[in-house]
């Protein structure tokens, strides 16, 4: 994959700092009416996206949960979603510029706290997802903040940061999930699927459907520039799409019918894989 995704704790801190600053910069340059623009994340506006980032980082910083009632919302369908929505609901009546200023105050505190983790990178941290080591926790935060940064960018029509560490890490997470997603896509045993991202983040990976314990299993074939000898034979379908299209689909933000991609091989196979490719809750 090029550029390579961050993996070391120091690299992940830098990736977090980069996407967190991008969210701040976007917020600071929003006109008042732009805060109310809808985003590709169901039910959330531009301001809501920033509120969500603040809410999660605030919770990790020890802030108490907001005392608000979320109520019935069609995009909230589980307890975790309810937890996320409380932070957004608590700020719905707050003017957009004030929400941005809250992030401007919290963000440097979080960066400083993450730098402190370098002293003990093996420690276990309590997070909403359970106990995680610092690198695992930072990786989760990078892809979450970067994903919501992209939600904001699309709403504002300011596409960018698609060659960033956050973009590379999100791309990696989607491709890492491919074996399980292909296995669940209902494809015939023996089917091979290749996904190529054409840029700005460039990557290529392949999965073959095999039988394991009587069930379909996605066997990863390679990661790199070419299939091993003999593994390109048979029912092979290649899906090519940009970093933007892959990550928007992986985030569940764009329906397959609205996705731009190219297929070599079976179109129906490609559609089944893309339908199953969402990795977000």
What are these regions (language model features)?
Residues 1-11, 60-116:
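Short, helix-capping/interhelical loops that line the mouth of catalytic, cofactor-
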Residues 1-39:
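Non-cleavable N-terminal signal-anchor transmembrane helices
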Residues 24-45, 113-132:
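Helix-loop segments that flank and shape redox-cofactor active sites
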Residues 36-77, 128-184, 246:
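Short, contiguous alpha-helical
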Residues 87-161:
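Contiguous mid-protein beta-loop-alpha structural module that forms a pocket-lining wall or clamp
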Residues 167-211:
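A glycine-rich beta-turn/hairpin centered on an aromatic-Pro dipeptide
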Residues 197-238:
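Acidic/His-leaning functional-site neighborhoods
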Residues 227-281:
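C-terminal interaction segments
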């Amino acid at each position: 994959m090029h550029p390579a995704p961050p993996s070391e704790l120091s690299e992940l801190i830098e990736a977090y700092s980069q996407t967190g600053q991008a969210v701040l910069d976007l917020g600071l340059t929003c006109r008042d009416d732009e805060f109310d623009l809808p985003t590709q994340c169901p039910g959330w506006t531009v301001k809501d996206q920033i509120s969500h980032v603040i809410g999660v980082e605030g919770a990790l910083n020890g802030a108490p949960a907001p005392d608000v009632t979320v109520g019935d919302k069609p995009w909230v369908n589980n307890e975790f979603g309810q937890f996320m929505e409380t932070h957004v609901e608590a700020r719905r009546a707050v003017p957009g510029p004030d929400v941005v200023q809250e992030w401007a105050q919290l963000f440097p505190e979080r960066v400083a706290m993450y730098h402190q983790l370098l002293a003990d990178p093996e420690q276990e941290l309590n997070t909403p997802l359970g106990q995680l080591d610092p690198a695992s926790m930072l990786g989760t935060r990078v892809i979450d903040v970067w994903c919501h940064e992209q939600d904001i960018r699309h709403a504002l029509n300011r596409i960018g940061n698609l060659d960033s560490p956050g973009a590379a890490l999100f791309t990696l997470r989607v491709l890492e999930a491919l074996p399980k997603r292909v296995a669940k896509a209902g494809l015939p045993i023996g089917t091979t699927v290749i996904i190529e991202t054409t840029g700005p983040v460039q990557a290529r990976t392949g999965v073959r459907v095999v039988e394991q314990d009587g069930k379909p299993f996605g066997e990863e074939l390679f990661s790199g520039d070419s299939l091993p000898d003999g593994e390109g034979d048979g029912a092979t379908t290649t899906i090519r799409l940009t970093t933007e299209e892959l990550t928007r689909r992986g985030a569940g933000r764009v329906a397959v019918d609205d996705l731009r991609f190219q297929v070599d091989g079976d179109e129906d196979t490609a559609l089944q894989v893309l339908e199953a490719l969402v990795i977000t809750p």
